[in-house]
Structure formats: C-alpha cells, structure tokens
C-alpha cells in the first residue's frame, strides 16, 4: 500500500497503459514539456518522446479532430483539456464525430478515445473556467461519461477507459487533485458502468458523484450522530447510469436525494430523477429531492462561488426533512 494523490493516481494509470500498449498516446496543450496544467503527465515527455506526448497549439477543435482521426486508424489517443470548459470549442468534433462515427460508418470504425481534464467549481477560476460539461454531453449518442472522485476509482476507471473501444469523457474535479488515499500496488481495473455503494444504509438513498461525494460524506457524519442511516451511492458512470445498483437501493430505502454540482436545469440530477420516476415510482414514499448548483454563472469571488454550489448543511437539512415523511 502506498499513499497517492489523485493526480498521481491518474498519472500512474496513464503511465501503466502507455507502457502496456504502444498505441496509447496523449495530446493537448502543455502536456509534454510542461507536464500538464495539473502535472498529470509530468516526466512523460522524457520517457515517451514527441510522438506519444504531443504538445498542441491552442486549438481544441483541431487537435480533438486529429485525435479522432488517430483513433480511426487504430491508435488510442487521450486528449487532455487544460480546462474542460475549453472543450466547448471542440463540441462539433466530440458530438458529431467521436460520438457518431462508429454508427455512421456502419461499424467499420471504432473510436477508442479518452477525453479528460479538470472541471467543476473551485479555485476562483471564474465563470468560463468553472463549467460542468456533463449536462452538455449526456444527450450525445455514442459517448460514455465517467466522473472520478477518489485516487482509487480515478486510477481504475481511467485504465478501463483507455482500453475501451468507445469514446469516453472522463471528468476530473479541479479541487480533488490533491485528495490522498492508500492504493494497492497490484494492477486493477474498475467497470466503467458500475456505481459504488460508498455507505450502506436503510433510511434514504443519496445519489451523488465527483466532489459532491465528499460533501455528502461530511453531512453523513452529522446525520449518523443524529440517528439517521443514509445509503450513499457514488454513481461514477454518468452515462449509462447503473440503474441496477440504484434500483436495489431505492427498493430498500424508498426515499431518494440527489446531490450534484451540475446545474439544476438539464443536469445529471434531472436525468436521474426521470429514470427513477419511470422505473421505480411505486417504491417511493416521498418525492425525489434534487440539490443542484444554481442556474447562474459562477462568480469569481470565493464566498460567492461557494454559495452557488451545495454545501453539507443543505444536505443535512434535506435528509432530515425527507426522513420525517412516513
């Protein structure tokens, strides 16, 4: 066992897969000589050279298209967005090409590409650099979406994403890179389509992902001391949703609280709520509650920035109110 930070776990995943498979390469702004904006590829340029660590111009649409073309020829490119918000400039490439080329080519082309990088609210990065793109990409056919939340699942999910023959959008939260955890030294992979039951419980199901997993766990400490028994599920796979794991929990607790950093309108929470109501309505004893970020641009001010996202005290209050419903 060794203590590893999240960005180090992601680096280890990339390093192991690049050693294992010479078709794996990384491209993006400052991923080579500089080692990436959050040092996830630090030292890789010296180890793997210019052909497998491609420093690109500031042209997201162009280098994402280049990566998709490389994937069509049999390579396994990993695109790093310096900030996930910048990938809006490559939306056409991701949606119309990465997501659909396998279908529109009649199955002749696989698109084994991973698009990863930092996003979310934090570090006072301002409105343009605090985007949550999961709401944008969830409706694009052909894309898988994963959000890591710990060094353990970050490493295991990224390795699986690289080996996957489908395009995967891999979300990393800017505030979680220095999160530490003891990891086993043996190689492991995690299923891209499986949620994690973080804490078993009987009173209420709390569905969450990414940074909000940790806000929920903070709230859970208080709730347990007050006598509540929440079941916490990190959904991990944003698309497709692991409705099997979610269904088992809802049938047991009969109450659902969704906690996300995504916007309330059109977010992952809205999709989760719709899926649960469609399949599990008869098992619910209370309306589904969804705690989401406000539908406003993220302020630069630190205190105002925090006010736009859900905090642990709001989770505690929501659980207490829902558990009063018989």
Curated annotation (Swiss-Prot):
Gene: pdhB
Record field: catalytic activity: N(6)-[(R)-lipoyl]-L-lysyl-[protein] + pyruvate + H(+) = N(6)-[(R)-S(8)-acetyldihydrolipoyl]-L-lysyl-[protein] + CO2
Enzyme class: oxidoreductase
EC number: 1.2.4.1
GO cellular component: chloroplast
Keywords assigned: Chloroplast, Metal-binding, Oxidoreductase, Plastid, Potassium, Pyruvate, Thiamine pyrophosphate
Binding of K(+), residues: 113, 161-162, 166
Binding site for thiamine diphosphate: 60
Assembly with partners or alone: Heterodimer of an alpha and a beta chain.
Organism: Chaetosphaeridium globosum
Chain's role: The pyruvate dehydrogenase complex catalyzes the overall conversion of pyruvate to acetyl-CoA and CO(2). It contains multiple copies of three enzymatic components: pyruvate dehydrogenase (E1), dihydrolipoamide acetyltransferase (E2) and lipoamide dehydrogenase (E3).
Domain of life: Eukaryota
GO molecular function term, any single one: pyruvate dehydrogenase (acetyl-transferring) activity
Named cofactor requirement(s): thiamine diphosphate
Record protein name field: Pyruvate dehydrogenase E1 component subunit beta
